Amino acid sequence: MFTTSSRCSSLKRGKKTEGISAYSSSRCSSLPRNGIGNPYHPPTAPTQSESESEVPTHSSVRPSNAMVSLARRPLSAAVPAGNLLGIHLFRCPDAVGIVAKLSECIASRGGNIHSVDVFVPDDKPVFYSRSEFTYNPRLWPRHELHKDFLNLSRCFNAQTSTVRVPDLDPKYNISILASKQDHCLFDLLYRWQEGRLPVHINCVISNHDRPQDNHVRRFLQRHGIPYHYLPTAPANKREKEILELIQGTDFVVLARYMQILSENLLKAYGKDIINIHHGLLPSFKGGNPSRQAFSAGVKLIGATSHFVTPELDAGPIIEQMVERVSHRDTLQSFVVKSENLEKQCLAEAIKSYCELRVLPYELRKTVVF
């Protein structure tokens, strides 16, 4: 059994160990839960796999930087019968032997690592990793799994150490805030209905009223999801009521909610809030970014999903998507193209977050595995 008193065994980067090929590289290949972007709350995430013979060695990069990158394969194909998939997200000061001790922790319980992604920045000795592994829950009960990874985190003074077992752990409980435009909201509801978003929707909150026969209201009623209409005014953003409704959720999604959340609400909530901005940040912040982009004569437009911080449209970016435009495009075609990008971008950011692919990196950045 792994304990905190165990001496952290060493692993020379660039050498192969137990089916994992470690090598030096500053590139980051490519999964998040809990407290990833909120400045008042820390985060989490998972990984992938492939045979060690397919992992190249980059000798030109100095050995202090490391990445273990194993190509993805379908998770269903990677989980033997009777076993479960586990995902581990890790952030700690860089040190020799982290991957070796991670492998030892899992292997000592009969588990098998299927993929590991590691990133160490060029200019900062911080170790980021996401791992996917399979294990037999009869041999490694969930509470023991949690305890072993807690010991691992203590061994390396980790800032983040999150382990998630999707088939055992509850789905993320979320609330969605939206305004008049509902293309992002309805897209999320449709993906949720299709089983493509691993979340439980606690409620939908809007500052725009929708009649009972509205397609969104009918969908919510059919699926038993509460809808709360909270009209806002400059002097009253209804944040007390919003806070009461979102308490108990794991994170909140702003699906084109056209109100600025105060710093007091962010502090009181204390968890991550994911926003979609209909522009390619950091350009075209604030209102009407499509018109700003059209007036600037850009050749690419985009959408940005990011964590909400007190500074408007300045939180760490999770996902961005772009599409080419030309002199033939009109302002209306900019808007139509942007809406398609917004739906995809927001859904992808939520999926990455739920799959433990996101970690905070410096003040305004993220590592997205």
Residue map of PLM features:
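Eukaryotic intrinsically disordered, low-complexity regulatory segments enriched in serine/threonine
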Residues: 12-14, 44-50
